[in-house]
């Protein structure tokens, strides 16, 4: 396959060949250029608060151990014994000073160093250099306000720079709210879909909500219920979409703090969020304070998505070109009353948990998109994401990134696939940066500040 062929994904992200959702050769290329190169979500501070705490996570198809060190730092290692390649840790989470392989008993410290080998002197003599046999370490581990990401590529930009313009929109909730927590362990389910299908949807697709989720909207009586069955468009000025250089993007639905949740939760959620408004107005200004109380439908490129006010946090772990393991956490504000946290966690399970009704609505879409990508006639067709193209702006006086000032559009789709195509066709971060020099002119007209 010619990965520099612009017909695979157009430079502006306007079109993508359907086969990208089902081609196994391309999937192997993604492991090399997407998952081995970009920042991938690992865990949250709240899940490993103390020295020795660890979780097992995934980076692409590889499993890693993420461990809090004695000095408070966080490191991550491949979950593979260096002796014969066996999986080292099978637990999802725990606290340990080290890890012992159940095959031959080799023991590794929480710092990844090989510390003990049964009968080392008797069997190996001086032939084994333990200093060279530690666990393979993930090159970069950094935090975005408590959310821990890892990257295998030393040449990647810092996590802060990688978040880029998207970070400006996320910080009101992730930082200025007082901080967030993830409630784990995550719910896990396998869907027969390519990882990009849900990732693109969560990057800000408000277009499907009224139709795909019609029955869920009617039964739940959320603040978005008026959209059910495409009975109406969101009113003018109801939201915006944005995207950024490295592919992260989102849709913003103004003042949607109670999210997708049903009427019984709305008064308490609105009261809790509203109590912070005066402080946030003073600290970060009225625009970003409004972003805090608005519903963000976001994907951090490539495979981490969340709905801020709905408390839904997902990672789309690829298994193969047509199979994805979905991890779902509940995301809550640290200072929420414990009873409200509990009720929000329950609501996340009802809506977007492994058997949630909103989740079930989406899965049929994701799976058939991916299944059709393998069929002979349909795989070479072009998928389009041109909704709102030509109306996006770069250089807005208020809102950073490429911005489409409508609740419904495909601005964030285009940014996601522009970055995706640039990575697939590049052999390194340096080449990606070179082909991305004009990323904003490919996606939007530029305004003078």
Swiss-Prot record:
CDD domains: RHO_alpha_C_NDO-like, Rieske_RO_Alpha_N. Its EC number is 1.14.12.12. Pathway: Aromatic compound metabolism; naphthalene degradation. It catalyses: naphthalene + NADH + O2 + H(+) = (1R,2S)-1,2-dihydronaphthalene-1,2-diol + NAD(+). One of its GO terms (molecular function) is naphthalene 1,2-dioxygenase activity. One of its GO terms (biological process) is catabolic process. Disulfide bonds: none annotated. It is an enzyme of class 1 (oxidoreductase). Binds 1 [2Fe-2S] cluster per subunit. Binds 1 Fe(2+) ion per subunit. Its cofactor is [2Fe-2S] cluster; Fe(2+). [2Fe-2S] cluster binds at residues 81, 83, 101, 104. Fe cation binds at residues 208, 213, 362. The keyword Metal-binding applies. Belongs to the bacterial ring-hydroxylating dioxygenase alpha subunit family. The naphthalene dioxygenase (NDO) multicomponent enzyme system is composed of an electron transfer component and a dioxygenase component (iron sulfur protein (ISP)). The electron transfer component is composed of a ferredoxin reductase (NdoR) and a ferredoxin (NdoA), and the dioxygenase component is formed of a heterohexamer (trimer of heterodimers) of three large alpha subunits (NdoB) and three small beta subunits (NdoC). This is Naphthalene 1,2-dioxygenase system, large oxygenase component.
């Amino acid at each position: 396959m010619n990965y520099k062929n612009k017909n695979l994904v157009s430079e502006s992200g306007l079109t993508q060949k359907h086969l990208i959702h089902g081609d196994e050769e391309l999937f192997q290329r993604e492991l090399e250029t997407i998952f081995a190169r970009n920042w991938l979500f690992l865990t949250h501070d709240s899940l490993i608060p103390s020295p020795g705490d660890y979780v097992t996570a995934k980076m692409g198809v590889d499993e890693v151990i993420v461990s809090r060190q004695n000095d408070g730092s966080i490191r991550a290692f491949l979950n593979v014994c260096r002796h014969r390649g066996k999986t080292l840790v099978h637990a999802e989470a725990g606290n340990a000073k080290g890890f012992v392989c159940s095959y031959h008993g080799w023991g590794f410290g929480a710092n990844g160093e090989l510390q003990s080998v049964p009968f080392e002197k008797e069997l190996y003599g001086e032939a084994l250099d333990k200093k060279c046999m530690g666990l393979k370490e993930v090159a970069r581990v950094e935090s975005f306000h408590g959310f821990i990401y890892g990257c295998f590529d030393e040449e990647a930009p810092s996590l802060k720079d990688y978040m880029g313009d998207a970070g400006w929109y996320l910080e009101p909730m992730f930082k200025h709210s007082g901080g967030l927590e993830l409630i784990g362990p995550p719910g896990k389910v396998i869907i027969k879909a390519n990882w990009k299908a849900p990732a693109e949807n969560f990057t800000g697709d408000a277009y499907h909500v009224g139709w795909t989720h019609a029955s869920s909207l009617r039964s739940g009586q959320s603040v978005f219920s008026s959209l059910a069955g495409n009975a109406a468009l969101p009113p003018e000025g109801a939201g915006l979409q944005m995207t950024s250089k490295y592919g992260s993007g989102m849709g913003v639905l103004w003042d949607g703090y109670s999210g997708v949740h049903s009427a019984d939760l709305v008064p308490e959620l609105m009261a809790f969020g509203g109590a912070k408004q005066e402080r946030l107005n003073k600290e970060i200004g009225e625009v970003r304070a409004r972003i805090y109380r608005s519903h963000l439908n976001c994907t951090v490129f490539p495979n981490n998505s969340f709905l801020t006010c709905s408390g839904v946090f997902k990672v789309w772990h690829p298994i193969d070109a047509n199979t994805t393991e979905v991890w779902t956490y509940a995301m809550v504000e640290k200072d929420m009353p414990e009873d409200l946290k509990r009720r929000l966690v329950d609501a996340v399970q009802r809506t977007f948990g492994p058997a949630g009704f909103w989740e079930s609505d989406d899965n049929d879409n994701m799976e058939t998109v991916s299944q059709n990508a393998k069929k002979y006639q349909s795989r070479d067709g072009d998928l389009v994401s041109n909704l709102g193209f030509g109306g996006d702006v770069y250089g807005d006086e208020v809102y950073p990134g490429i911005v489409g000032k409508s609740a419904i559009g495909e601005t964030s789709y285009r940014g996601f696939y522009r970055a995706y195509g640039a990575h697939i066709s590049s052999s390194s971060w340096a080449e990606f940066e070179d082909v991305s020099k004009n990323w904003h002119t490919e996606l939007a007209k530029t305004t003078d500040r």
